[in-house]
Swiss-Prot record:
KW Lyase (keyword) present: no
Gene: CROT
Pfam families with a match to the protein in the record: Carn_acyltransf
Cellular compartments annotated: Peroxisome
Lineage of the organism: Eukaryota, Metazoa, Chordata, Craniata, Vertebrata
Name of the protein in question: Peroxisomal carnitine O-octanoyltransferase
Oligomeric form and interacting partners: Monomer.
Residue positions of motif Microbody targeting signal: 610-612
Length: 612
């Protein structure tokens, strides 16, 4: 990253935005062909035949008309999906988003210079905060390197949403407020908000034209910490952000109606660079076991994180850190980038601040004191109760598999991401006795404002291989051949999805055109196989590769009887974070992770046994 930053004077972060290609609309015939292929693992012959007829009827009838209208829409937009996706996937969703939509993850500093240690929260916090603020300055100066695949630049628009961004609840649809500006565009907010024990404080991070230093940040954080630990807790307004969206919107309107000053305070939080959260707990963490820390970050104290904020930087009493982010403005890879940057800086400086200890005479933090009444306090208590009830139902299993990693799989000519995806398919098959429809995130940032496409990893080839692994009459050579066929299929599909040739977003576009035109929902979308194969947000496995760095993440399952499964890949290990709902008797995150680890061994054994 440092080398990249050195080169970055030649290129500006956002300089290629105008030259990126528009998001293409795939061919209707190709999309429907791929869709039919994806439902096969979940259908018997009769069901498949019925779906095939529905698809043929759709293709020659209403589907073609909708497709033509979609092509018309695409002519006038560089990204025909962007606004739709934001609304349908995020802003129209009414369930509580802090737990159900946000993503979270631990900072990797505990693996090197910052193992858990009581009494380090404030000093370490000042250092990690300073490195985050440096990244903010690089972004304002457009010195964050442009992401590329080979020499092809990727869309960088999501980086605009990292700082000074917040979702605002609406009665039927939320909105996103983004206050960030690059230096060439003008002024940008330069304050952060700190939440501690139900209270909120604000201070500027620029003093007399210069960024505050870690010793100065330490003074500010110490002031807040002492004040909150020697005085009564605050009302915990932040807990309202964990509520069901329409209820939060109404509670917010009431809060603003109570006193106009409350709106000014809310806007201070919305426009802040980030929210820095001070937790009192000390979650256990080791480089092999992430379960407790990940749970603490994802489902910690609702009064000290602002669920709608694009970036909550969370600190714990034992000096470990993490982030909790609203998913609407950006995808996890943006957070991975800043997390890796900060971790590298902490590593390079051996976890210490090596600069001046001088503290300038900077103004003390100012407390944001909301005007509240009985109704607001009651709303807060109701939000907390709802959040804690749902959060207590979540099971998290997050561990490192350390027998081998990317180095060995590459050596065996196996793509490491596909390796994990197929191991997960086998684990699910062994645990549940049938295939699991699976969503893997594919990246479409080759295109203007591109975000993601759905890659359906539960292929016919993957299922045939899983069946062969459970059938004692199938020999090793045949099992290996079936596995390699599953690898080839997966790799091709991932390539297609990243090139704008996936089908899930295309089908969504056709459905939304029908809705906008006031037409009945086409039979393709009401066919039981559509949802049984994962369509309409019904994937039992919701998965994503977090990358190849020391950064891990987690999300909750997409459906009640499903799993969230995030993982990252290193030379010597695979780290997996799996979530499930305890109230679902069918699912068990611990078992699924352990069976996935067993599958890793089985797959490598398969390659070893056949001397390839």
């Amino acid at each position: 990253m440092e080398n990249q930053l050195a080169k970055s004077t030649e290129e500006r972060t956002f300089q290629y935005q105008d030259s990126l290609p528009s998001l293409p609309v795939p061919s209707l015939e190709e999309s429907l062909k791929k869709y039919l292929e994806s439902v096969k693992p979940f259908a018997n012959q009769e069901e498949y035949k019925k779906t095939e007829e529905i698809v043929q009827k759709f293709q020659s009838g209403i589907g073609e008309k909708l497709h033509q209208k979609l092509l018309e829409r695409a002519k006038g937009k560089r990204n025909w999906l962007e606004e739709w996706w934001l609304n349908v996937a995020y802003l129209d969703v009414r369930i509580p988003s802090q737990l159900n939509v946000n993503f979270a993850g631990p900072a990797a500093h505990f693996e090197h210079y910052w193992p858990p240690k009581e009494g380090t929260q404030l000093e370490r916090g000042s250092i990690t905060l300073w490195h985050n603020l440096n990244y903010w300055q690089l972004l304002r100066k457009e010195k964050v390197p442009v992401h590329k695949v080979g020499n092809t630049p990727l869309d960088m628009n999501q980086f605009r949403m990292l700082f000074s961004t917040c979702k605002v609840p609406g009665i039927t649809r939320d909105s996103i407020m983004n206050y960030f500006r690059t230096e060439s565009e003008g002024r940008s907010p330069n304050h952060i908000v700190v939440l501690c024990r139900g209270r909120a404080f604000v201070f500027d991070v620029i003093h007399e034209g210069c960024l505050v230093t870690p010793p100065e940040l330490l003074r500010q954080l110490t002031y807040i910490h002492k004040k909150c630990h020697s005085e009564p807790d605050g009302p915990g307004i932040a807990a309202l952000t964990s509520e069901e969206r329409t209820r939060w919107a109404k509670a917010r309107e009431y809060l603003i109606g109570l006193d106009p000053e409350n709106l000014a305070l809310l806007e201070k939080i919305q426009s802040s660079l980030l929210v820095y959260s001070m937790e009192d707990s000390s979650p256990h963490v080791t480089p092999e076991d992430y379960s407790e820390i990940i749970a603490a970050i994802l489902i910690g104290d609702p009064t000290v994180r602002w669920g709608d904020k694009s970036y909550n930087l969370i600190s714990f009493s034992n000096g470990v850190f993490g982030c909790n982010c609203d998913h609407a403005p950006f995808d996890a890879m943006i957070m991975v980038n800043i997390s890796y940057y900060v971790d590298e800086k902490i590593f390079q400086n051996e976890g210490r601040w090596k600069g001046s200890e001088k503290v300038r005479d900077i103004p003390l933090p100012e407390e944001l004191i909301f005007i509240v009444d009985e109704k607001v306090l009651n709303d807060i208590n109701q939000a907390k109760a709802q959040y804690l009830r749902e959060a207590s139902d979540l099971q998290i299993a997050a561990y490192a598999f350390t027998s081998f990693g990317k180095k060995l799989t590459k050596n065996k000519m196996l793509h490491p991401d596909t390796f994990i995806q197929l191991a997960l398919q086998l684990a699910y098959y062994r645990l549940h006795g049938h295939p699991g429809c699976c969503y893997e995130t594919a990246m479409t940032r080759h295109f203007y404002h591109g975000r993601t496409e759905t890659m359906r990893s539960c292929t016919v080839e993957a299922v045939r291989w899983c069946q062969s692994m459970q059938d004692p009459s199938v020999n090793l050579r045949e099992r290996q051949q079936k596995m390699l066929q599953a690898f080839a299929k997966h790799n091709k599909m991932m390539k297609d999805c990243s090139a704008g040739k996936g089908f899930d977003r295309h089908l969504l576009g056709l459905l939304l055109i029908a809705k906008e035109e006031g037409l009945p929902v086409p039979e393709l979308f009401t066919d039981p196989l559509f949802s049984k194969s994962g369509g309409g947000g019904n994937f039992v496995l919701s998965t994503s590769l977090v990358g190849y760095l020391r950064v891990q993440g987690v999300v909750v399952p997409m459906v009640h009887n499903g799993y969230g499964f995030f993982y990252h890949i290193r030379d010597d290990r695979f780290v997996v974070a799996c979530s499930a709902w305890k109230s679902c008797p069918e699912t068990d995150a611990e078992k699924l992770v352990q069976l996935t680890f067993c599958a890793f061994h089985d797959m490598i054994q398969l390659m070893n046994s056949t001397h390839l």
